[in-house]
Design a protein with these regions (language model features):
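A hydrophobic, multi-pass inner-membrane permease signature
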Residues: 1-252
């Protein structure tokens, strides 16, 4: 009997993608995902660079203690239940901001940014202060323009993390209209893999020599739908990526 697995596709079809976009919620999910990626990345870069520049100051009171406490959070986490309770007390559950606020600062990226700032000559900062620049003016006019490589790397990693995250939507948001695209597709794939109609549909498709949508083909279509948009961002930051990652790795 002829099987359903072929080395070459028997027929070109877009049915897999039609199945992915058949549910209108995918469009809303894309809007939520794009919004959380843009807003979350921008706010995260702002907070991370400000905190990194502050920790770079050698005259900051308790600088070593603050750094030690921040690093401590990399080794020990609070766990899911305490995190859920904390989000509930902060009124973040079932809210768009549950995607943004908890991920404002990543310790790894913070230390990377601080290390990069420490590599900038102090003479530039001192010259800015002699010209009358304060903390924020020096940060905006001196530090940020010189930090494009590390900002590009941190921004790309943060954007990818926001784009790929399905966990927050699945566990902290009950309103399906606030789900990101990853959560929607994860639920869609779960239903497709558990569907008892798949074997029947494949058998009918083989009998009529047509193309059927299976859980595997739907999974591959979902992978394309979710990865292509974020891949389009990479060429714009590629020239900064290697330089910034190398600096963070060598000096971190």
């Amino acid at each position: 009997a002829r099987g359903g697995v072929w080395f070459w596709p028997r027929q070109f079809t877009m049915n897999n993608f039609k199945e992915v976009f058949k549910d209108g919620s995918i469009t809303t999910a894309y809007v939520i995902t794009i919004a959380r990626t843009v807003i979350g990345t921008f706010l995260s870069l702002m907070v991370t660079t400000l905190a990194g520049y502050a920790l770079k100051q050698e005259d900051l009171p308790g600088r070593k203690l603050i750094t030690m406490l921040i690093t401590f959070t990399m080794l020990f986490g609070g766990g899911m239940i305490p995190t859920y309770i904390q989000y509930k007390n902060l009124h973040l559950l079932n809210s768009f901001w549950v995607y943004v606020v908890p991920s404002l600062v990543s310790v790894t990226y913070l230390l990377m940014v601080r290390t990069f700032f420490e590599g900038i000559p102090d003479s530039l900062e001192e010259s800015a202060k002699l010209d009358g620049c304060g903390f924020f003016q020096t940060y905006l006019k001196i530090m940020l323009p010189l930090s494009k490589p590390v900002i590009a790397v941190v921004g790309l990693y943060t954007a990818v993390n926001h784009w790929n995250d399905w966990f927050a939507g699945a566990f902290y948001v009950n309103d399906t209209k606030l789900w990101p695209v990853q959560t929607v597709l994860q639920q869609m794939l779960t239903k497709a893999m558990n569907s008892q109609q798949e074997v029947t549909s494949v058998a009918q498709a083989l009998a009529h020599n047509t193309v059927s949508v299976t859980s595997d083909s739907l999974k591959m279509a979902a992978v394309v739908v979710t990865t292509v948009p974020i891949l389009c961002v990479y060429p714009f930051v590629q020239k900064y990526f290697a330089q910034g990652a190398m600096i963070g790795a060598v000096k971190g």
